[in-house]
């Protein structure tokens, strides 16, 4: 499954960066579009790509530079990472820290600790976590549907490691889907645990409806345009990975486009 998901992620990233409709949506600045009455793209707000800081990110950038032209922070040159940290205090959070803080938020919401995983600190200083085996339990007065729709915001989100944890933001090392700890990852787990898995039309529609609600419930903000794009793309890829794990294939293009529309509105 890991190899399949790796292949799927590469396929979705290719679509996100080459398909006109999907890419144009991921680049759309919804705020400026609404204020000005005409379509506007998110701005670079950084000089590292040889573009004017206030210039919009255009589709042609990927056509001219290639689909790998925008890469995660961890894959950027060390000097560039240092410059971004000095200029805008950009510091990304390791996944184990995101997990511990998300665990605290869930403990407050659910009223119980370690609902999704238990954290482990090895003698060598490496931090790990073990996913819980039993389904997540909900307190009286709250249901799994409430959890899926509960709103969460990551401010100065960078590549949104608190929302989705496809990879560790500090190392770019991929994280198996079973060990992901982002807010949206947790919502997808809850959906899988509480909806039927038999691949009927009705069951797929139910899962999709709840999954879209989950995507609609997470918000993020960042100053730099490449971070905004990477965050949007990561949520889109995560959705497709969970869809494929559940139903054995990637979602069709209209569904991918629908998710892109939602993601462009919440980040």
Which residue ranges define each predicted feature?
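Preference for the N-terminal adenyl/adenosyl cofactor-binding alpha/beta module
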Residues: 1-167, 226
């Amino acid at each position: 499954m890991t190899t399949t998901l790796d292949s799927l992620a590469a396929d979705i990233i290719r679509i996100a960066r080459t398909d006109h409709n999907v890419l144009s949506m991921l680049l759309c600045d919804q705020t400026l579009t609404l204020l000005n009455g005409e379509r506007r793209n998110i701005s670079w707000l950084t000089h590292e790509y040889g573009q004017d800081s206030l210039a919009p990110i255009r589709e042609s950038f990927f056509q001219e530079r290639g689909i790998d032209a925008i890469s995660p922070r961890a894959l950027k040159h060390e000097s560039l990472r240092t410059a971004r940290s000095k200029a805008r205090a950009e510091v990304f959070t390791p996944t184990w820290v995101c997990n511990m803080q998300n665990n605290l938020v869930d403990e407050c919401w659910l009223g119980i600790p370690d609902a999704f995983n238990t954290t482990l600190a090895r003698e060598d200083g490496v931090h790990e976590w073990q996913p819980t085996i039993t389904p997540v339990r909900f307190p009286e007065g709250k249901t799994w549907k409430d959890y899926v729709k509960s709103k969460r915001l990551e401010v100065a989100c960078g590549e949104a490691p608190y929302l989705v944890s496809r990879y560790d933001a500090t190392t770019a090392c991929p994280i198996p889907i079973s060990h992901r700890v982002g807010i949206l990852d947790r919502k997808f787990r809850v959906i899988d645990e509480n909806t039927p898995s038999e691949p009927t039309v009705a069951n797929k529609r139910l899962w999709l409806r709840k999954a879209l609600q989950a995507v609609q419930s997470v918000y993020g903000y960042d100053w730099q345009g490449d971070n905004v794009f990477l965050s949007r793309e990561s949520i889109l890829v995560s959705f497709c990975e969970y869809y494929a794990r559940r139903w054995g294939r990637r979602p069709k293009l209209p569904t991918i486009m629908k998710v892109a529309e939602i993601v462009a509105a919440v980040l």
